[in-house]
A protein has these predicted regions:
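A short N-terminal interaction module
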Residues: 1-58
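Conserved AdoMet
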Residues: 33-107
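Short loop/edge segments at beta-strand edges and connector loops
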Residues: 75, 163-164, 238, 262
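Conserved beta-strand segments of alpha/beta enzyme cores
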Residues: 84, 134, 158-160, 256-259
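Class I S-adenosylmethionine-dependent transferase superfamily signal
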Residues: 127, 197, 220, 224
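Conserved Class I SAM-dependent methyltransferase catalytic core
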Residues: 210-273
Length: 276
């Protein structure tokens, strides 16, 4: 690995614990991080000679990938809704499916929004970037809130971030929209996840007990009943296995206009509901 064009073959030869297409993507992300080159830049600069520092950086990335560390944590950043976000293992890595949740919310008119379980701040910051609305967000993790605040600065937006536990959140403010992508993967489903997720992403943000999979949805819905403005909306990202149970729970709590939306993979992923 002495010139730029050798990088992708080196990644493919060294990394066998991810699909080929993902490894190629990891290589391009690494090149962009180290050299600032796009894919087209790679063609123009294919004969660029790598320095010893470049080679050491790339070998470190390859070594970390072989340990199943997510590329986003290795590089310390990811992209969401066209914005750059810093991430580490105290924050869940933003997913493409969650971009659909943001885009859906942006179809509505609102003056105030609360994001519950904000993590890296990706939902709150993306919405604040694209609206003039007042945006607030909470997370139980102080480390996540610290990262979210840094991401707000990076993206030049104002969001009211607070460290708070939704189960002990005494907030008198009301909002036009409340949104949450809460923990929704049952502990028994760990075996179905890639090792890089289970070993490195924060379990606090991922998993719920099999005995009470709707614990966060129920609490957030109850909170929304008292803290949504009249005709306000509640948005959830969900585990598709529990879509019917969540709809039933919202119906029992007298939410109206309940809608189930599919994601880009044709899976039940978002539930929108409203109060009268």
């Amino acid at each position: 690995m002495n010139i730029l064009s050798n990088i992708i073959p080196s990644f493919l030869n060294s990394i066998t614990n991810f699909p080929r297409r993902e490894v190629i993507s990891f290589a391009y992300l690494s090149i962009e991080k180290i050299f600032g080159f796009s894919k087209s830049d790679c063609i123009v600069n294919s004969k660029k000679v790598l320095t010893n520092e470049n080679i050491n950086q790339l070998n470190k990335i390859i070594g970390d990938l072989k340990k199943n560390i997510p590329i986003q944590y290795i590089l310390g950043e990811t992209t969401f809704c066209g914005l750059k976000f810093n991430v580490n293992n105290s924050t869940l890595i933003p997913r493409n499916e969650t971009e659909e949740l943001v885009n859906l919310i942006l179809n509505y008119k609102f003056n105030s929004l609360l994001d519950i379980g904000t993590g890296s701040g990706c939902i709150a910051i993306s919405i604040a970037k694209k609206t003039a609305s007042s945006v607030s967000a909470i997370d139980i993790s102080h480390q996540a809130i610290s990262m979210a605040k840094k991401n707000a600065i990076i993206n030049n937006v104002s969001v009211d971030f607070r460290a708070a536990d939704i189960f002990n959140f005494d907030d008198k403010r009301k909002y036009d929209i409340i949104v949450s992508n809460p923990p929704y993967v049952c502990e028994s489903d760990k075996q179905n996840l890639h090792k890089n997720v289970v070993d490195h992403e924060p379990h606090l943000a991922l998993f719920v007990k099999d005995s009470n999979p709707l614990i966060f949805y129920k609490r957030i819905a109850q909170y929304a009943l008292t803290n949504l403005n009249k005709k306000g909306h509640l948005f959830f990202e969900i585990n598709e296995k529990y879509s019917n149970q969540i709809i039933e729970m919202l119906t029992d709590l007298n939410f109206v206009e309940i809608e189930l939306k599919k994601d880009i993979n044709d899976r039940n992923r978002i539930i929108k509901s409203s109060i009268k």
